[in-house]
């Protein structure tokens, strides 16, 4: 009986001691993340501070415990067993022994541990890059403390072949976008600019049903500044264009020649109106009047326009003035040449227009004749001190209208001109070269042609002027050549005072047209049909030959034997006169 009581007392005492020492160690276990294996434990709160801890480990299937260097009699409550448990295919055990200052000790062992199964995955390392309409996420590789046989440090991708990255993007907790894959770069596109998003990235291991702790990032897309760039580009372009324009204007201002001084502007003080040649025509006579066959040489004339000196330079405006066309009549006049010595060629003359009398009409308008009677113009005699004045009047039916044509001859034979018809002139019908300077037909008009210096041959310096006289059939025997006094100049009288003087370029002087002269015939009692110029004074008429002939007006050429028709000469020609007031 006494022995039984002793055994019960010893067992109760041993149980009490064991219960007291078990409070020295609590929660001994492995904590592994990304294959980093840490052994941790806890002690009781009232344990004395002088308690020390020792760690031992062993592989599953072995009986001997191995001490961990650096984890013997330590006061901290953790020990890193990563290198000792680095084999992913092995199972491990570990135990901890705690000893206090009173000499009491306690030992606890962990459960069986497999790093491949029990390790946890940490959140990945991700960089979020915001853009205007997208967010780019780059996942960095996660390295583990496990090393390969060659010493290279392994990553999670090297250990888990089926590792995936799962990404989520949320907008105000209402809208989500998902991306998943093994690549390390992802981008969410089609986002709203200047908007905040919440991104979540996790590592998933489907075979082990493992997921990492999610990595969360808040990112805001960039504001859309495209319009700002466009506006800036447009502004810079406009600024460059403005600078270029200013540079161009400055260049034009610097290189612009200065305006000429007003003292050089002599347009308002010129005593004449310059003649401007604006159009050039060609007259081609149909038949030769000199008796030889063949077509005549073409004659060129220019249309002359007088510019207003008070107006600025430039083409003066055209007035709506009527155009006068001279057409041939069915009845033809008789051509009566006048003989006389040839004159010398006129030098290049210079003409200046002068003001015409205000009382005279400013335009010439031919008056229509009666239907039964064609018009005929009869010259009237005027005095030297009075300008000629003509009035057209009707003539009897048997008087055909006459044409007057004046040309310039020379000492040589004139160019061949075709005869006007079957009643052509013989030897007497040809134009005589010796025509007095002032001789004209009784009913016609003499116009001495002035040839420019550029068109005149130097060998024609002694050429003379010829006057073709045209008579009607009824007046061919009764009319005579007018007498002129010595010293008077041959003149061309007309009805319309359009030009008072004429100036030709290259001649030093002016040819006035105001000097009145005697009529071509004492029988001039009517207006002249060629009265466009008031008077055309030729200085060359004062040569000795002209003066001698002027003193002897009785010298006349014999009358033509037969009349010559000139209708074919002017057929198809439309002569137009234009003038400006």
From Swiss-Prot:
One GO term (biological process): cytokine-mediated signaling pathway
Signal peptide stretch: 1-15
Transmembrane segments: 229-249
Segments of this protein annotated with the region Disordered: 354-493, 539-563
Molecular-function GO terms, alphabetical: cytokine receptor activity
GO CC, one annotated term: plasma membrane
Domain (Fibronectin type-III) ranges: 18-115, 141-221
Entry keyword RNA-binding: no
Positions annotated as glycosylated: 80
Membrane topology of this protein: Single-pass type I membrane protein
Modification after translation, per record: Ubiquitinated.
Protein's cellular compartments: Cell membrane
Swiss-Prot/TrEMBL keywords: Cell membrane, Disulfide bond, Glycoprotein, Membrane, Phosphoprotein, Receptor, Repeat, Signal, Transmembrane, Transmembrane helix, Ubl conjugation
Pfam family name, one: Tissue_fac
Positions on the Extracellular side per record topology: 16-228
Keyword DNA repair in record: no
Biased segments, Polar residues type: 378-389, 440-449
Cystine pairs: 71-79, 128-217
Cytoplasmic topological domain residue ranges: 250-581
Residue positions where Phosphoserine is found in the record: 410, 414
Family: Belongs to the type II cytokine receptor family.
Physiological role: Component of the receptor for IL20, IL22 and IL24. Component of IL22 receptor formed by IL22RA1 and IL10RB enabling IL22 signaling via JAK/STAT pathways. IL22 also induces activation of MAPK1/MAPK3 and Akt kinases pathways. Component of one of the receptor for IL20 and IL24 formed by IL22RA1 and IL20RB also signaling through STATs activation. Mediates IL24 antiangiogenic activity as well as IL24 inhibitory effect on endothelial cell tube formation and differentiation.
Subunit structure comment from the entry: Heterodimer with IL10RB and with IL20RB. Interacts with FBXW12; the interaction promotes ubiquitination of IL22RA1.
The protein's name in its UniProt record: Interleukin-22 receptor subunit alpha-1
Gene (UniProt): IL22RA1
